């Protein structure tokens, strides 16, 4: 930041979307002068709600946003560092751990999948994609909750799942939440089925702790929505995004943007964030998944679910859904370009899933 342009040391300057730094940074910093209270008189020159304009409000609802805790605990300088660095570091660690789980504990595949997600152009240009960091972390916690050997481990994991669940729900952006929600739900189903023996061993008192944690999650979400009720009401009464209805179609081109994404650091474009994608070699992962399913005779539930979702998302991105189907599946809240983003994630999950199935057990 600053008021004087400084010439770069090396390379060429490119225009870049400014929302994530030139807009957000001043908003975060103004909250300090309100002591992170309910109202902010600085950002718009009049009374506005801090939680709506800055996302920072020191109350019970702040439990829904772990990346902001640094502001309340250590002040704005360290808080901003945490805000920028914590989600990215978390995504790196947890994406590798997530792929370690679905790759049958194959470390090479785990690192490969984790790097393809965490260091993808999609993550780099958007920076700190919240539904990825909290979603994948929640999946890891759920897996280890199911497969934990000791009660204390499940008691620690339960509130972690609750906070991550609250964070995911309070993203309040269904364009990402709906398609990613189907993916995450499918993975949870696979975790339960594949670990059914361990799932049945979960004790009653452990379920009670988990249930209490879910109530804890619900309380955070309710308070958060109450604190943001004015903002939510105003947004829902707008033409965009409040009244937007999507039925899909005509966005499959975006699935091939991974080719261009590689060159975005070297060639200026109008909106790198919108067009960036994970490098997936689409549609090859889907073709290989079909081959593997035929060869494995459909015995891998995760591969079946991920390929099924890939086919559904491909249909939505090409020809679209009838309006009634879009409404029933909640895809009416999902612009086709956003569905393509999640289709990209599926194209990373698929090759990790079928590659580990084709490797020797002890490889």
Predicted regions and their residues:
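Short, small-residue-biased leader/transition segments that mark boundaries at the very start
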Residues: 1-5, 358-362
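Transmembrane signal-anchor helices characteristic of membrane glycosylation enzymes that use polyprenol
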Residues: 2-24, 212-229, 310-316
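Active-site lumenal/periplasmic loops and adjacent helix-entry segments of GT-C-fold
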Residues: 6-133
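Membrane-helix boundary/interfacial segments in multi-pass membrane proteins
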Residues: 78, 82, 121-130, 299, ...
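Membrane-embedded helix bundles of polyisoprenyl
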Residues: 92-98, 106-195, 205-228
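Transmembrane alpha-helices and membrane-interface helical segments
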Residues: 94-101, 137-147, 187-192, 288-292, ...
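Membrane-interfacial loop-to-transmembrane alpha-helix junctions, especially the N-terminal start
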Residues: 104-110, 151-158, 298-312, 357, ...
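Periplasmic/ER-lumenal interhelical loops and adjacent helix-loop junctions
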Residues: 221-302
């Amino acid at each position: 930041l600053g008021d004087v342009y400084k010439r770069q040391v090396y390379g060429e300057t490119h225009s870049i979307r400014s929302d994530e730094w030139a807009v957000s940074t001043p908003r975060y910093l103004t909250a300090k002068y309100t002591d992170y209270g309910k109202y902010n008189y600085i950002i718009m020159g009049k009374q506005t709600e801090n939680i709506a304009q800055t996302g920072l409000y020191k109350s019970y609802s702040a439990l829904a946003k772990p990346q902001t805790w640094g502001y309340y605990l250590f002040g704005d300088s360290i808080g901003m560092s945490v805000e920028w660095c914590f989600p990215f570091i978390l995504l790196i660690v947890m994406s590798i751990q997530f792929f370690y789980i679905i790759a049958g504990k194959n470390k090479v595949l785990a690192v490969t999948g984790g790097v393809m997600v965490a260091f993808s152009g999609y993550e780099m240009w958007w920076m700190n994609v919240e539904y990825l960091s909290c979603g994948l972390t929640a999946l890891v916690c759920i897996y280890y909750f199911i497969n934990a050997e000791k009660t204390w481990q499940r008691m620690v994991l339960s509130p972690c799942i609750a906070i991550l669940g609250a964070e995911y729900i309070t993203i309040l952006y269904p364009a990402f939440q709906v398609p990613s929600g189907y993916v995450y739900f499918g993975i949870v189903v696979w975790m339960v089925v594949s670990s059914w023996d361990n799932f049945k061993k979960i004790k009653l008192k452990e379920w009670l702790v988990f249930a209490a944690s879910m109530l804890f999650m619900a309380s955070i979400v309710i308070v958060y929505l109450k604190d943001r009720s004015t903002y939510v009401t105003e947004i829902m009464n707008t033409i965009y995004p409040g009244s937007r209805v999507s039925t899909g179609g005509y966005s499959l081109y975006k699935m091939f943007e991974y080719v261009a994404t590689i060159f975005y650091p070297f060639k200026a474009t109008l909106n790198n964030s919108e067009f960036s994608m994970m490098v997936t070699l689409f549609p090859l992962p889907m073709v290989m998944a079909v081959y593997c399913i035929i060869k494995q005779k459909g015995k891998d539930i995760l591969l079946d679910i991920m390929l099924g979702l890939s086919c559904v998302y491909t249909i939505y991105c090409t020809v679209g859904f009838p309006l009634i189907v879009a409404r029933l599946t909640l895809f009416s809240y999902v612009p086709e370009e956003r569905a393509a983003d999640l289709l990209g994630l599926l194209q990373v999950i698929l090759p990790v899933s079928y590659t580990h199935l084709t490797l020797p057990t002890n490889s």
